[in-house]
Amino acid sequence: HFCISSHAVHYWRGRSKEGKPVDARIINTTSGAGLQGSIGQSNYAAAKAGIAALTLNQAAELGRYNITANAVAPSARTGMTSAVPEMAERMAKPEDGSFDHFAPENVSNLLAWLASAEAESVTGRVFEAEGGRICICDGWRTTAGVDSGAAWAPAEIGAAMKALLAEEVPAQQVWGT
């Protein structure tokens, strides 16, 4: 993702510096494993989480050149999913001709839209796409906090954390748990 996009960005920034118009899109592919974790796939989850973070940074850095950056976490039938018997069975094309929830084209339509002029102001977003459902993923962000006004003593942290965590939404469940 980074290597490919860095070459494209080099070209687009050059055009911008020459005063030529730029209307460019970066659309990265991440995974639900990177957004929510996945038991037994720490390496894959970390790599895919890195792509989501890369996307957010690209959006912040490249907007001034009229380059948008977004990511999609698709849930669709692929060669990789077909190689895992349990997933292949769950994601199989319906034999009765009903809606094919895991057909790759369900995701490709979102990609086409993100590449379109209509999406020119959409940047720094991570989406999940599965079947007829598109979701915005709202990842890591700072929520409630507690400030002691000074350095914390180790003995003080436990009570403060219990109170803080009692106010928070429960942590996201990791896939496979």
Role assignments for model-derived ranges:
Residues S31:
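Residue(s) in the substrate-gating loop at a strand-loop-helix junction
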Residues G34-Q36, T78:
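Conserved catalytic-site region of short-chain dehydrogenase/reductase
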Residues Q36, A52, N57-I67, A117-S121:
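Active-site-adjacent segment of SDR/Rossmann-fold oxidoreductases
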Residues A60, A71-H101, G139-A144:
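A glycine/serine/threonine-rich, flexible loop-to-helix segment
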Residues S5, A47:
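Active-site helix of classical SDR
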Residues H7-V22, A117:
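A short helix-coil junction within the Rossmann-fold of NAD(P)-dependent oxidoreductases
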Residues Q36-S42:
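Active-site loop immediately N-terminal to the catalytic Tyr-X3-Lys motif
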Residues A92-T177:
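C-terminal helical subdomain
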